Amino acid sequence: EHHGFSKTAAKTPWLKRRYLPYPVLAREIVKSFDALPLKDVPRKVRVGVVGEILVKYQPDANNHVVDVIESQDCEAVVPGIMEFMTTRPYITDWNEKYLGTGGNKTLYALMRWSLDRYNAPIKAAIATSHGKFKQDDPMPELVEKAAEVTSIGVQAGEGWLLTAEILELIEQGCPNVICAQPFACLPNHVTGRGMFGKIRRLHPDANIVSIDYDPGASQANQLNRIKLMI
Protein backbone atom coordinates (compact mmCIF):
# COMPACT_ATOMS: atom_id res chain seq x y z
CA GLU A 1 0.00 0.00 0.00
CA HIS A 2 1.42 3.34 -1.07
CA HIS A 3 1.09 5.42 2.09
CA GLY A 4 1.88 2.66 4.57
CA PHE A 5 -0.21 1.61 7.58
CA SER A 6 -3.47 2.06 5.61
CA LYS A 7 -3.81 5.76 6.40
CA THR A 8 -6.57 6.14 3.84
CA ALA A 9 -8.70 3.60 5.71
CA ALA A 10 -8.90 5.98 8.69
CA LYS A 11 -10.75 8.54 6.54
CA THR A 12 -13.99 6.62 6.33
CA PRO A 13 -17.13 8.62 7.19
CA TRP A 14 -19.21 5.46 7.65
CA LEU A 15 -17.21 4.68 10.82
CA LYS A 16 -18.99 7.58 12.54
CA ARG A 17 -22.42 6.02 12.08
CA ARG A 18 -23.79 4.08 15.03
CA TYR A 19 -25.33 1.30 12.96
CA LEU A 20 -25.02 -0.12 9.48
CA PRO A 21 -26.70 -3.27 8.14
CA TYR A 22 -24.20 -6.12 7.99
CA PRO A 23 -24.11 -6.37 4.15
CA VAL A 24 -23.63 -2.59 3.85
CA LEU A 25 -20.86 -2.64 6.45
CA ALA A 26 -19.05 -5.42 4.56
CA ARG A 27 -19.28 -3.46 1.30
CA GLU A 28 -18.03 -0.25 2.92
CA ILE A 29 -15.05 -2.00 4.51
CA VAL A 30 -14.00 -3.57 1.21
CA LYS A 31 -14.61 -0.31 -0.66
CA SER A 32 -12.38 1.62 1.78
CA PHE A 33 -9.45 -0.75 1.40
CA ASP A 34 -10.03 -1.16 -2.33
CA ALA A 35 -9.61 2.61 -2.70
CA LEU A 36 -6.12 2.60 -1.19
CA PRO A 37 -3.50 3.67 -3.77
CA LEU A 38 -0.98 0.94 -4.54
CA LYS A 39 2.60 1.18 -5.72
CA ASP A 40 3.13 0.11 -9.32
CA VAL A 41 5.69 -2.59 -8.52
CA PRO A 42 5.87 -6.36 -9.11
CA ARG A 43 4.07 -8.40 -6.49
CA LYS A 44 6.26 -9.49 -3.60
CA VAL A 45 7.06 -13.10 -2.80
CA ARG A 46 4.17 -14.49 -0.74
CA VAL A 47 4.79 -16.50 2.44
CA GLY A 48 1.88 -18.24 4.16
CA VAL A 49 1.57 -18.90 7.89
CA VAL A 50 -0.40 -21.88 9.19
CA GLY A 51 -0.20 -23.95 12.35
CA GLU A 52 -1.51 -24.33 15.88
CA ILE A 53 -4.25 -21.78 16.47
CA LEU A 54 -2.53 -19.71 19.19
CA VAL A 55 0.94 -19.74 17.63
CA LYS A 56 -0.55 -18.91 14.23
CA TYR A 57 -2.27 -15.70 15.33
CA GLN A 58 -0.60 -14.47 18.55
CA PRO A 59 2.49 -12.36 17.70
CA ASP A 60 4.12 -12.97 21.08
CA ALA A 61 3.74 -16.73 20.62
CA ASN A 62 5.31 -16.79 17.12
CA ASN A 63 7.99 -14.15 17.74
CA HIS A 64 6.18 -11.73 15.41
CA VAL A 65 6.57 -13.99 12.39
CA VAL A 66 4.48 -11.68 10.16
CA ASP A 67 6.87 -8.80 10.92
CA VAL A 68 9.82 -11.10 10.17
CA ILE A 69 8.31 -12.05 6.80
CA GLU A 70 7.65 -8.42 5.88
CA SER A 71 11.16 -7.41 6.99
CA GLN A 72 12.44 -9.78 4.27
CA ASP A 73 10.46 -7.78 1.67
CA CYS A 74 7.82 -10.51 1.37
CA GLU A 75 4.03 -10.56 1.69
CA ALA A 76 2.61 -12.47 4.66
CA VAL A 77 -0.54 -14.52 4.01
CA VAL A 78 -2.44 -15.78 7.07
CA PRO A 79 -5.65 -17.81 6.53
CA GLY A 80 -8.71 -16.67 8.48
CA ILE A 81 -10.05 -18.09 11.74
CA MET A 82 -13.63 -18.63 10.55
CA GLU A 83 -12.85 -22.05 9.06
CA PHE A 84 -11.34 -23.30 12.34
CA MET A 85 -14.46 -22.26 14.24
CA THR A 86 -16.90 -23.95 11.85
CA THR A 87 -15.43 -27.32 10.84
CA ARG A 88 -17.91 -29.58 12.64
CA PRO A 89 -21.04 -29.04 10.48
CA TYR A 90 -19.08 -29.90 7.31
CA ILE A 91 -17.74 -33.31 8.38
CA THR A 92 -20.94 -34.90 9.69
CA ASP A 93 -21.21 -37.29 6.72
CA TRP A 94 -17.72 -38.68 7.38
CA ASN A 95 -18.36 -38.96 11.11
CA GLU A 96 -21.65 -40.77 10.56
CA LYS A 97 -20.17 -43.21 8.03
CA TYR A 98 -17.02 -44.16 9.93
CA LEU A 99 -17.73 -43.30 13.57
CA GLY A 100 -21.51 -43.36 13.88
CA THR A 101 -21.38 -39.91 15.49
CA GLY A 102 -22.87 -37.78 12.75
CA GLY A 103 -25.38 -36.22 15.12
CA ASN A 104 -28.59 -34.47 14.14
CA LYS A 105 -28.45 -34.11 10.35
CA THR A 106 -31.21 -31.51 10.26
CA LEU A 107 -29.46 -29.38 12.87
CA TYR A 108 -26.11 -29.51 11.06
CA ALA A 109 -27.78 -28.77 7.73
CA LEU A 110 -29.34 -25.70 9.33
CA MET A 111 -25.94 -24.69 10.72
CA ARG A 112 -24.35 -25.01 7.26
CA TRP A 113 -27.14 -22.91 5.75
CA SER A 114 -26.74 -20.26 8.45
CA LEU A 115 -22.96 -20.11 7.98
CA ASP A 116 -23.34 -19.79 4.22
CA ARG A 117 -25.84 -16.96 4.73
CA TYR A 118 -23.48 -15.24 7.17
CA ASN A 119 -20.54 -15.46 4.76
CA ALA A 120 -22.52 -14.46 1.66
CA PRO A 121 -22.32 -10.64 2.20
CA ILE A 122 -18.56 -10.87 2.76
CA LYS A 123 -18.02 -12.91 -0.39
CA ALA A 124 -20.24 -10.54 -2.38
CA ALA A 125 -18.33 -7.52 -1.08
CA ILE A 126 -14.92 -9.04 -1.87
CA ALA A 127 -16.13 -9.94 -5.36
CA THR A 128 -16.52 -6.21 -6.09
CA SER A 129 -12.78 -5.61 -5.59
CA HIS A 130 -11.88 -7.05 -9.02
CA GLY A 131 -9.54 -9.70 -7.64
CA LYS A 132 -7.50 -7.45 -5.35
CA PHE A 133 -8.56 -9.45 -2.28
CA LYS A 134 -8.47 -13.23 -2.01
CA GLN A 135 -11.62 -15.26 -1.49
CA ASP A 136 -11.23 -18.14 0.96
CA ASP A 137 -12.12 -21.54 -0.42
CA PRO A 138 -15.54 -22.81 0.73
CA MET A 139 -15.40 -25.35 3.55
CA PRO A 140 -16.62 -28.28 1.39
CA GLU A 141 -13.66 -27.65 -0.94
CA LEU A 142 -11.24 -27.59 2.00
CA VAL A 143 -12.62 -30.95 3.14
CA GLU A 144 -12.00 -32.37 -0.36
CA LYS A 145 -8.46 -30.97 -0.46
CA ALA A 146 -7.58 -32.49 2.91
CA ALA A 147 -9.02 -35.87 1.91
CA GLU A 148 -6.48 -36.05 -0.95
CA VAL A 149 -3.64 -36.17 1.58
CA THR A 150 -4.93 -37.27 4.98
CA SER A 151 -8.06 -38.66 6.63
CA ILE A 152 -10.92 -36.42 7.73
CA GLY A 153 -10.88 -38.58 10.87
CA VAL A 154 -7.75 -36.72 11.98
CA GLN A 155 -9.64 -34.20 14.09
CA ALA A 156 -7.42 -33.62 17.14
CA GLY A 157 -6.00 -30.12 17.39
CA GLU A 158 -6.32 -28.30 14.06
CA GLY A 159 -6.55 -31.74 12.47
CA TRP A 160 -7.19 -32.12 8.76
CA LEU A 161 -7.86 -28.37 8.42
CA LEU A 162 -4.14 -27.64 8.86
CA THR A 163 -3.34 -29.86 5.88
CA ALA A 164 -6.17 -28.26 3.87
CA GLU A 165 -4.86 -24.74 4.57
CA ILE A 166 -1.39 -25.66 3.30
CA LEU A 167 -2.90 -27.03 0.09
CA GLU A 168 -5.16 -23.97 -0.26
CA LEU A 169 -2.18 -21.59 -0.01
CA ILE A 170 -0.13 -23.55 -2.55
CA GLU A 171 -2.99 -23.73 -5.05
CA GLN A 172 -3.65 -19.99 -4.69
CA GLY A 173 -0.10 -19.08 -5.69
CA CYS A 174 1.60 -19.10 -2.29
CA PRO A 175 3.93 -22.13 -2.35
CA ASN A 176 6.08 -20.79 0.50
CA VAL A 177 4.50 -21.86 3.80
CA ILE A 178 5.61 -21.63 7.42
CA CYS A 179 3.97 -24.26 9.64
CA ALA A 180 4.19 -22.79 13.16
CA GLN A 181 3.61 -25.07 16.12
CA PRO A 182 4.46 -25.57 19.80
CA PHE A 183 7.25 -28.09 20.32
CA ALA A 184 5.01 -30.65 22.07
CA CYS A 185 1.82 -30.34 19.98
CA LEU A 186 1.73 -33.90 18.62
CA PRO A 187 -1.52 -33.57 16.57
CA ASN A 188 -0.04 -30.65 14.65
CA HIS A 189 3.19 -32.49 14.00
CA VAL A 190 1.09 -35.27 12.43
CA THR A 191 -1.16 -33.09 10.24
CA GLY A 192 1.55 -30.51 9.58
CA ARG A 193 5.08 -31.86 9.36
CA GLY A 194 3.83 -35.41 8.81
CA MET A 195 2.01 -34.40 5.61
CA PHE A 196 4.89 -32.49 4.01
CA GLY A 197 6.15 -35.47 2.00
CA LYS A 198 2.83 -36.24 0.31
CA ILE A 199 2.09 -32.55 -0.27
CA ARG A 200 5.47 -32.14 -1.98
CA ARG A 201 4.76 -35.13 -4.20
CA LEU A 202 1.47 -33.53 -5.25
CA HIS A 203 3.00 -30.05 -5.56
CA PRO A 204 6.74 -30.20 -6.38
CA ASP A 205 6.94 -26.39 -6.12
CA ALA A 206 5.89 -26.46 -2.45
CA ASN A 207 8.44 -24.76 -0.20
CA ILE A 208 7.31 -25.65 3.33
CA VAL A 209 9.20 -25.31 6.59
CA SER A 210 8.14 -26.38 10.08
CA ILE A 211 9.09 -23.96 12.87
CA ASP A 212 8.81 -24.94 16.55
CA TYR A 213 7.89 -22.07 18.86
CA ASP A 214 8.62 -22.79 22.49
CA PRO A 215 10.06 -20.80 25.43
CA GLY A 216 13.21 -22.89 25.17
CA ALA A 217 13.54 -22.65 21.38
CA SER A 218 16.33 -20.60 19.84
CA GLN A 219 14.98 -17.47 18.15
CA ALA A 220 18.14 -17.34 16.03
CA ASN A 221 17.39 -20.81 14.65
CA GLN A 222 13.81 -19.78 13.89
CA LEU A 223 14.98 -16.71 11.98
CA ASN A 224 17.62 -18.68 10.09
CA ARG A 225 15.14 -21.33 8.97
CA ILE A 226 12.67 -18.69 7.76
CA LYS A 227 15.37 -16.78 5.88
CA LEU A 228 16.73 -19.97 4.29
CA MET A 229 13.22 -20.91 3.14
CA ILE A 230 12.70 -17.49 1.57
Language-model segments: residues:
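An N-terminal assembly and electron-transfer interface module characteristic of large anaerobic redox
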Residues: 1-230
